[in-house]
Amino acid sequence: MKTLLLTLVVVTILCLDLGLELTNAPDSWSSRRTCLCPAWVPLRSRPVAGHSKQCGSRGRRVDLGCAATCPIVKPGVNINCCSTDNCNPFPKRS
């Protein structure tokens, strides 16, 4: 019985796609970053733009990545959460 149960678990893992994949970089980037998270986690892809001392002369700092939930917004930080591919393009310079 244990062998049958173990076999079913292995087959399920191999046959089902247990990950949700979002691409987090626009096509123009030379390397695309991809987040793989379990399908049961509500995945959010979020760019976070804010000013920092190191990057003040270069414009806004933008972080693209995955999070299980949309983070709490802090003053001076712009957060955009989404759950589809390429929904958070890198902002264009103005």
Curated annotation (Swiss-Prot):
Keywords: Acetylcholine receptor inhibiting toxin, Disulfide bond, Ion channel impairing toxin, Neurotoxin, Postsynaptic neurotoxin, Secreted, Signal, Toxin. Pfam families: Toxin_cobra-type (PF21947). Disulfide bonds join 35-55, 37-66, 70-81, 82-87. GO terms for molecular function: acetylcholine receptor inhibitor activity; ion channel regulator activity; toxin activity. Residues 1-19 form the signal peptide. GO terms for cellular component: extracellular region. Expressed by the venom gland. Its main location: secreted. Belongs to the three-finger toxin family. Long-chain subfamily. Type II alpha-neurotoxin sub-subfamily. Binds with high affinity to muscular nicotinic acetylcholine receptors (nAChRs), whereas it binds with a low affinity to neuronal alpha-7/CHRNA7 nAChRs. Has the length of long neurotoxins, but only 4 disulfide bonds, as short neurotoxins. In addition, the position of cysteine residues is not conserved. This is Long neurotoxin-like OH-31. The lineage of its organism: Eukaryota, Metazoa, Chordata, Craniata, Vertebrata.
